[in-house]
Amino acid sequence: MHPGGGPSRAERLELGLGRERPAKAIFLHRRPGEGGGRERCLRCGHVCVRRGPGPREAVPSGRPRPDTLTPPWVRQRAVTGTFCASWTPLRNRRAQRMATDMQRKRSSECLDGTLTPSDGQSMERAESPTPGMAQGMEPGAGQEGAMFVHARSYEDLTESEDGAASGDSHKEGTRGPPPLPTDMRQISQDFSELSTQLTGVARDLQEEMLPGSSEDWLEPPGAVGRPATEPPREGTTEGDEEDATEAWRLHQKHVFVLSEAGKPVYSRYGSEEALSSTMGVMVALVSFLEADKNAIRSIHADGYKVVFVRRSPLVLVAVARTRQSAQELAQELLYIYYQILSLLTGAQLSHIFQQKQNYDLRRLLSGSERITDNLLQLMARDPSFLMGAARCLPLAAAVRDTVSASLQQARARSLVFSILLARNQLVALVRRKDQFLHPIDLHLLFNLISSSSSFREGEAWTPVCLPKFNAAGFFHAHISYLEPDTDLCLLLVSTDREDFFAVSDCRRRFQERLRKRGAHLALREALRTPYYSVAQVGIPDLRHFLYKSKSSGLFTSPEIEAPYTSEEEQERLLGLYQYLHSRAHNASRPLKTIYYTGPNENLLAWVTGAFELYMCYSPLGTKASAVSAIHKLMRWIRKEEDRLFILTPLTY
């Protein structure tokens, strides 16, 4: 016993009282005749020890029950029940409710992206998400896992650019040892097939490597696409050349690709031959700084940005006077680099320049310029590249599940990805288990299909490299439109170049299942309205928005409507989104929320760990109305998420 008359802690444990009286326990008057015993907690229902006087009860061993002893120090006002430590007294609960109400009130008044503590993130799919929501709980998050490489943010997509800018020759996506000579022969054969498919002219890589083969090269007459060189036309005067030069300078963005030896490879505008001296200056800048063990990344002067990205053996340069940041311009240059890899593979590109450092790469890329041109045009008007995500065709969840299940059942042993798309929008995607597609690879596939109308003529079997998945070799893609008069394109990616007939049979079985289940009619109906109107949201002043779920790698946006009907206005709107995006993802000082006011529209950006939201609002709207509209928009996206996103992706 302690000097104060109470038992020690060991004695209390021996008596069965267990833990000491909680500091937050409430004393209740003991009812007459009420004894001790075990009963459930007054608040949570857990079985707890009652502490009260009562008769001694014998147990089979003859010892008194420890939980029925009446300790002598228990007063008349005794505890008749215990409470769990998690229970809070009424007074404290009221204080907590008041604090919660104040926090909620501040959340509605100020949108700073840091209102919810990081250790109190919501783990439920709430109807109206909060900035502190955990990733995977936001609207549009896949319930069965992600389809793409898990890139949480824009920075995750561009983090590899640092090594390239510093002169690192690392080939991202290349796995395993360098290809053997037999592998190079296989890659050469695949490239010859791809060249025939895209340009109509077969090229043999082995012949290209012969001495003197690159001297005095001219464009093959049968090549399709923009000529790599543009000789002066007859009758051209000096004034016409000056006008052409002035028109060339008026373009807001130029893209150049050249080899480390200074050989021109690609130019967005103009002739590569006419710009060879300019490209030589660019290579000299890069080489001069590298000799000092440094690297040039960008030059900012007179409203222009000059961005350099080096991916050995290539150097890519962008010159722009747009709202894009240097980081976003570098991302576009990386897309151009990956586009070149998708045609050649990283292994073949390295092999070529190991054999000939001054090789003219236009020999192999001749005729494919339209694919690169189309990619730059898509990046200028399609927000998919800005968001680093894919957009889904709005479709009823039951129909999408039927399409995905039909793709899953119509499979072959060599298939890696089965993709159904329509107008650069994703309808369904089924992948091999433990194999994930990168959004950049999906964008390159979209660009390949939209660049050529020949795929509508029948079933195509073409080599394709997915540089973010594996830059060392070719896959083989079966590309076909389900019906000539629709935009539904089926893309089946296989690892076996000899498996055409088996993959073609997968297409036949897929179409049979669609007709049997009636899904082809629903798909036709959905293609009549491939985009939804912003009026469906029900916010009067809302003109347009972009919403991305980071965990799923998908985003949604309505159709661009008035006043952005012209192509110039649409590019201007995307330019405003690019400006907000660059401020939100600034490497030195990123912003969580941005409210931009302009003469024609107001914009709001909100970037959290789970999602990104960009809104275009009427210039007559106020900041308070824009902030209050966010919750309504997020509730609408939550309500329509099964129609706008792929929530249950399937695997083989």
From Swiss-Prot:
* Record function comment: Plays an important role in membrane trafficking through the secretory apparatus. Not involved in endocytic trafficking to lysosomes. Acts in concert with CCZ1, as a guanine exchange factor (GEF) for RAB7, promotes the exchange of GDP to GTP, converting it from an inactive GDP-bound form into an active GTP-bound form.
Presence of keyword Flavoprotein: no
The family classification in the record reads: Belongs to the MON1/SAND family.
Write one Pfam family the protein is assigned to.
Answer: Fuz_longin_3
**Which InterPro entries does the record associate with it?**
FUZ/MON1/HPS1_longin_1 (IPR043972), FUZ/MON1/HPS1_longin_2 (IPR043971), FUZ/MON1/HPS1_longin_3 (IPR043970), Mon1 (IPR004353)
GO CC terms of this entry: cytosol; Mon1-Ccz1 complex
> Which residues are reported to carry the modification Phosphoserine?
128, 153, 188
Q: Name one GO molecular function term.
A: guanyl-nucleotide exchange factor activity
Q: Which GO terms describe its biological process?
A: protein secretion; protein targeting to vacuole; vesicle-mediated transport
Q: Which residues carry this modification: Phosphothreonine?
A: 158
What's the superkingdom here?
A: Eukaryota
Q: Give the multimer and partner information.
A: Interacts with CCZ1. Found in a complex with RMC1, CCZ1, MON1A and MON1B. The MON1A-CCZ1B complex interacts with RIMOC1. The MON1A-CCZ1B complex interacts with RAB7A and this interaction is enhanced in the presence of RIMOC1.
Q: What is this protein called?
A: Vacuolar fusion protein MON1 homolog A
Record keywords: Guanine-nucleotide releasing factor, Phosphoprotein
Region of interest: Disordered: 102-141, 158-185, 211-245
